[in-house]
A protein has these predicted regions:
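Catalytic beta-strand-to-alpha-helix segment of the class III nucleotidyl cyclase homology domain
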Residues: 88-175
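Catalytic NTP-binding/metal-coordinating core of nucleotidyl cyclase/transferase enzymes
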Residues: 1-101, 108, 112
């Protein structure tokens, strides 16, 4: 039996276009991943980042901060990849709080996101990463109706920066 969860799906809008238009600055992204380093402080002060680097690093920094805060209050399972993430919590109120907080963090940084929240099953089965000199094999095995419904809410066709609820979540608003 899989417990039902409120699942948040976050997607950065326009990320494919940024990836096509701008050079991937891996060194800058690696530096941004070490927030207290001298290089990271220099990068912040110089603000020479291209939009792809800025959006990617701001998204992941903000996402990590919001998840860390949420984990202090309740159980959270988060799966992040590229320009999107799924976050599962036990209660809709917690999921909505995460979505609102993330939107508050990202808007001033000009990182456009649309967020969908669904309610249903969620199971994180397996995560693995095998890195060798020749390459790597990475897998994130997770699934459930909460995953499908949160994605459906986000991609329902309504344009703009929004937090959208799937019908499955509406009955849990008072909880």
């Amino acid at each position: 039996v899989v417990d039902s969860r409120a699942v948040v799906f976050i997607d950065v809008l326009g990320f494919a276009s940024l990836t096509e238009q701008y050079t991937l600055e891996l060194e800058q992204i690696k530096v941004a991943d070490r927030p207290l380093s001298v290089e990271s402080l220099n990068m912040i002060l110089m603000r020479r980042e291209n939009p792809l680097t800025q959006v990617f690093t701001a998204f992941h920094r903000s996402l990590e901060a919001v998840i860390d805060l949420a984990k202090m209050k309740h159980l959270v399972t988060a799966v992040t990849f590229s320009d999107s993430a799924f976050i599962a919590t036990a209660h809709l109120y917690d999921a909505a709080s995460i979505a609102i907080q993330l939107m508050h963090y990202l808007l001033p940084q000009r990182v456009p996101v649309r967020i969908g929240i669904g309610y249903g099953s969620f199971s994180a089965l397996r995560f693995r990463s095998d890195v060798t000199v020749e390459g790597g094999d990475h897998a994130a095995h997770f699934l459930g109706t909460g995953v499908v419904r949160s994605n459906a809410a986000e991609s329902c066709g309504i344009k703009g920066l929004r937090i959208l609820l799937h019908p499955s979540a509406i009955q849990h608003l008072g909880e």
